[in-house]
Swiss-Prot record:
Coiled-coil annotated spans: none
Gene3D superfamilies named in the record: Ribosomal protein L28/L24
Name used for this protein in its record: Large ribosomal subunit protein bL28
Top-level taxon of the source organism: Bacteria
Organism taxonomic ancestry: Bacteria, Pseudomonadati, Pseudomonadota, Gammaproteobacteria, Vibrionales
Protein family (similarity comment): Belongs to the bacterial ribosomal protein bL28 family.
Molecular function terms, GO-annotated: structural constituent of ribosome
Annotated segments matching region Disordered: 1-25
Cross-referenced InterPro entries: Ribosomal_bL28, Ribosomal_bL28/bL31-like_sf, Ribosomal_bL28_bact-type, Ribosomal_bL28_sf
Protein keywords: Ribonucleoprotein, Ribosomal protein
Gene Ontology process terms (BP): translation
Amino acid sequence: MSRVCQVTGKRPAVGNNRSHAKNATKRRFLPNLQTHRFWVESEKRFVKLRLTAKGMRIIDKKGIDAVLVEIRARGENV
């Protein structure tokens, strides 16, 4: 399973670890992914999403129904 937020689309970024001597070694910055079940009243069922903490705040703001419309418009099955 890929490390991509289903709401925001955030994915791992690539950067460097920097030592005290300024040596650079490659590293990945991973998104803060959580798996969360949301109750969708209009469908009378739970929907399981893999999303970041920011994605959860977006759902709090817009509502689960509006976010599901956006996700389905991109062609993802939910």
